[in-house]
Amino acid sequence: MKMYTTAAAGVLLAVAASSSLAQGELKPEKTWEVSAELGAIRTTGNTETESFNGKIDVVHRMENWKNQYIASALYKNDQVEQDDGTEQTETTAEKYFASAKSAYLLADEFSNLFVYGSHTHDEFGAYRKYTTVSAGYGARFIKRESLTLDAEIGPGYFWGDKVEDEDNDIIVKEEGFMVRTAAELKWAFTDNATFNQKLGAEVAEDNTRYVSDTSLSTKISDRMQMKVGYTVNHDTDVADDKEGTDTTTYINLVYNF
């Protein structure tokens, strides 16, 4: 646990230090962009379920820096049939994610050198905890009025708690160097609708993690959107009693502050 805490603290300190340095030398005007999204479902009667997912995305723009902070949570309760035939409400999904990224802007606002860190805690996933740190280069490869494509790549390091035996709570610790790549496509095909595709890969010797988030957003008002999406998380190295791929379909209400 200390290893994860130290890694996460180091990333956050690096982000804070870089931002403070830029503020002290350049004293630019600060610009904040904050969006929050929430989705929840509850059913009663013959089937009782409760599910919740939420996300907050904060972007801080300065003259030569762009910082981004993301936090999300997924929680679900379901009725589960026991060995004796009775049904009992149990938690079937509980996942938390947080990331921080600090990017130094180069010739234009889209080319950058970045430092990135993330931490995932998944009570029911193939990995109970997964922490990464990386640095690299990012750029915008398509820049049109309604269509953009951003991508980044760089080396990094990961720490993972692999669930080897769920019933006996046997955890195997893994760590090692990795290469991280990520891309995001945005297509505003009408004035009120936007398609978004995010892809990411963290390639290491022990495990490769792939992440995909596909979504369609439609405007309800200037500040509010309805968002329908589908996420895929895939790990290549999992225990025999674990699935390598987790998927989530969601409908969220998004508010832009």
For each predicted feature, which ranges?
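Residue-level signature of outer-membrane beta-barrel architecture
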Residues: L26, A40-R42, V58-H60, Y104-L106, ...
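Transmembrane beta-strand segments of Gram-negative outer membrane beta-barrel proteins
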Residues: K27-R42, W65-Y69, F195
